[in-house]
Amino acid sequence: MTRQTTSQTCLICGDSADSLHFGALSCRACAAFFRRKVAGRRNIFRRCDRQCKVDTGMRKLCASCRYDKCLKVGMRESAVLSRLAKKNQNYKKSIVGSPDAYEPSTSTSDSVLENLQSAYHKLEETRKRVFNISETHVSQCCNYKRMNDVFFEDIKLVMEHLLETFKKSDISQEQEKLLCVHFMVPFILFEGGYKSTNSDLFYLPSGDFIDENRIEEYYSNPDDQNDNSAKSAAEVFRPYWKLNKQTLKTHLDDVQLDLPEFLFITALIYFDDGLLDQNEECIEVCKQMKAKIIEELTDYEKNVRINEDHSYRVGQIIMVLHGIQRTMNMIHETKEISLVYNVYDMHSSIFGNMAE
């Protein structure tokens, strides 16, 4: 006698469901979406009136409504967090090998990841306060003026909260400044891409966004009633927006980084050992730090991806750095073109903080 199978439907998007995930019947795509959002502790910025339709065709368009529906049908954040806690405990055991390592400590940790997680959490909390981000915050589509204001303010926050974590006594202030200059813009672009995963929007630290399908709005100036420059600028730079999506954002969509992986890459961006005017002492420290970061990353992947090929995952993550470098090459070209067309000010927060 053959058992007749009945098709099951994902309670979130209506696609075919394979089993219960985190307490609700869902497809793998919605389960992975929910896990990423909870595990990554990402702020889900709302840009709608909570009435978006969530189905197989529209599920990627509004993360906030999709997340709300996950919770509504019974998915539990605690189910994700408990699983992560077990993996994180295995990770700490493999590094330290002592139960005492789980206890909070007032001393500075030797772990790159733990120090970065603490610093990034403080950065995110400060951003909420500075940019007035609350649970009821509704994201707004912004133009170049708003973007420049946000990034000029946020760069100061990044320097205060994140870069302090990277400082090493073996590196002079002059060399620290060199590393900082080469870090800032790649980090801005990388973090924006990370927070905009699976979206056609580019999210800013303020929660506002740039709609990459309507870049005329980004280049528009509401103070100028006869603003013809917006269309001209959009025509000039549209190919570069598309190229950025192909080189970095699409790559990040494929890799689907979690928060620790994002932070490991952030550290690798900073400790670059191939910069012009970098002295031998700085190069040596950067090489040592890169080796330590890769070692921690490898240990992390071994313990989080127990039944998967962790070495392949490490390779995927390292390749993200190549995508960031290609994007930076494109940004340098964009800067030159902006000077020719006299639209440098439309990207001044980016161009003004780039290394020459």
Curated annotation (Swiss-Prot):
GO cellular component terms, A-Z: nucleus
Subcellular location: Nucleus
Domain NR LBD: 108-356
DNA-binding region: 7-82
Record keywords: DNA-binding, Metal-binding, Nucleus, Receptor, Transcription, Transcription regulation, Zinc, Zinc-finger
Matches recorded under SMART domains: HOLI, ZnF_C4
InterPro entries to which the protein is assigned, alphabetical: NHR-like_dom_sf (IPR035500), Nucl_hrmn_rcpt_lig-bd (IPR000536), Znf_hrmn_rcpt (IPR001628), Znf_NHR/GATA (IPR013088)
SUPFAM superfamilies: Glucocorticoid receptor-like (DNA-binding domain) (SSF57716), Nuclear receptor ligand-binding domain (SSF48508)
Zn finger limits (NR C4-type): 10-30, 48-70
Molecular function GO labels: DNA-binding transcription factor activity; sequence-specific DNA binding; zinc ion binding
Main location: nucleus
Transmembrane segment boundaries: none
Keyword Transcription regulation: yes
Gene Ontology BP annotations: regulation of transcription by RNA polymerase II
Family from the record: Belongs to the nuclear hormone receptor family.
Protein's job: Orphan nuclear receptor.
PANTHER family named in the record: NUCLEAR HORMONE RECEPTOR FAMILY MEMBER NHR-42, NUCLEAR HORMONE RECEPTOR FAMILY MEMBER NHR-86-RELATED
Protein name (Swiss-Prot/TrEMBL): Nuclear hormone receptor family member nhr-42
Annotated organism of origin: Caenorhabditis elegans
